[in-house]
Amino acid sequence: MNGMMRGLFLLLGVCVLSGCKSVAPPTPLADLNAQQMHGHAVYQAHCAQCHYDRKNEALHGPALIGVFKKPYLPSGAPANDERATETIVHGRNLMPAMGNTLDQQDLDDLLAYLHSL
């Protein structure tokens, strides 16, 4: 029985640790390409007042660090460009819609920046 219990604890430990993935740190600002830099400027102008980009803490909205390095967005939706775009353009809960504020280039560049986080 002791051996079986040890085996179960070992299996449990392996299962727990396999779910603990570390997220790669954001790309340093100095290493961003031109599109990502413009996306950073869009973020600063329209997103920074509610979302941290390089700190894993909520401000008024969820932190955006590693947002595309996880399988799901903070809303629970799949972490992909389509779902993120839908949220940015149409808003969600407390987040205002940005569809009339951002043009397609701004949106594309913002997504490129979010992918660098």
Predicted regions and their residues:
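Extracytoplasmic electron-transfer domains, predominantly the class I c-type cytochrome c fold
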Residues: A58-L59, G66-L117
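Short hydrophobic/aromatic-rich motifs at helix boundaries and adjacent loops
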Residues: L17-K21, K55-A58, E82-R83
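Soluble periplasmic/extracytoplasmic beta-strand elements of cell-envelope proteins
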Residues: Q49, A63-G66
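Sequence/structural segment immediately N-terminal to covalent heme-attachment motifs in c-type
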Residues: L32-E57, E86, H90
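Sec-dependent bacterial lipoprotein signal peptides
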Residues: M1-C20
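Electrostatic cytochrome c docking/interface patches
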Residues: C20-V42, N80
